[in-house]
Amino acid sequence: MKVVFLRHGESIWNRENRFTGWTDVDLSSRGIEEAENAARLLKEEGFEFDVAFCSVLKRAIRTLWIVLDKMDRMWIPVEKSWRLNERHYGALQGLNKSEMAKKYGEEQVLLWRRSYDIVPPRLENDDPRHPRFDPRYRSLPADELPAAESLKDTLERTVPYWKERIFPAILSGQKVLVSAHGNSIRALIKYIENMSEKEIVGLNIPTGFPLVYDLDEQGNKLACYYLGDLEEIEKAQHRVAAQGKASS
């Protein structure tokens, strides 16, 4: 049984090297091209999806639209959930990662970006960026809305959704595409592969490259691989890893 994870194409704030989190930033022109390329790769490998799952953030939604349009699958059911949103970066959202590395040091920024259980500085409850002011989360209990999240927090909301909605669809024989974000995908991979906290620090998910997982009936990994040119994928992974370094 296969499932395809797709991190959205490059966003405008990815391009500007800013912490994005739950900020609803759109794709850059390069991100649109990455989504189109992802669709081409999936078509070339013969993928045809029956259902898709997506976050409620437009960079993932637009990536999914582009992919389904290019694959002539716009008609399939799409389920959107905030539980697939990017990790919430709290008060760091909107700030430049390299500038933060200069101010606080690369090690601190790496901990904020890639550690498992360290939470970045939280938003104040009256901060207009707090999700309680966003209409898309109006129906959710206030205590479920984060002011900041660690990867552990992200895993605790994504894994139940995987168990309740996504994996049952895979188990039923449906061909599933998940359009999400670097950290929500990292959280799911940590769960699927039973990765240690140390191992997850080094996992970097590039934008726009389909990641295929072959699973057994218990949801354990049998194999996984990216679609695309391996050299380009490695370069993209290195770019993700370098985002928290102080620029010279």
From Swiss-Prot:
Q: Which cysteines are joined by disulfide bonds?
A: none
Summarize where substrate binds, as residue positions.
7-14, 20-21, 59, 86-89, 97, 113-114, 182-183
Provide this UniProt record's keywords sorted from A to Z.
Gluconeogenesis, Glycolysis, Isomerase
Write down the superkingdom of origin.
Bacteria
Top enzyme category: isomerase
Swiss-Prot/TrEMBL catalytic activity: (2R)-2-phosphoglycerate = (2R)-3-phosphoglycerate
Example GO BP = glycolytic process
Please give the organism.
Methylacidiphilum infernorum (isolate V4)
One function term, GO molecular function aspect: phosphoglycerate mutase activity
Active-site annotation = 8 (tele-phosphohistidine intermediate), 86 (proton donor/acceptor)
Annotated site (Transition state stabilizer): 181
User: Function of this protein?
Assistant: Catalyzes the interconversion of 2-phosphoglycerate and 3-phosphoglycerate.
Cited Pfam families? His_Phos_1
Q: Which HAMAP family match?
A: PGAM_GpmA (MF_01039)
Q: Does the keyword Isomerase apply?
A: yes
Q: In which pathway does it act?
A: Carbohydrate degradation; glycolysis; pyruvate from D-glyceraldehyde 3-phosphate: step 3/5
Q: Carries keyword Isomerase? A: yes
Q: What is this protein called?
A: 2,3-bisphosphoglycerate-dependent phosphoglycerate mutase
Instruction: Supply the EC number(s).
Output: 5.4.2.11
Q: Which InterPro entries match?
A: His_Pase_superF_clade-1 (IPR013078), His_PPase_superfam (IPR029033), Phosphogly_mut1 (IPR005952)
UniProt lists the family membership as follows: Belongs to the phosphoglycerate mutase family. BPG-dependent PGAM subfamily.
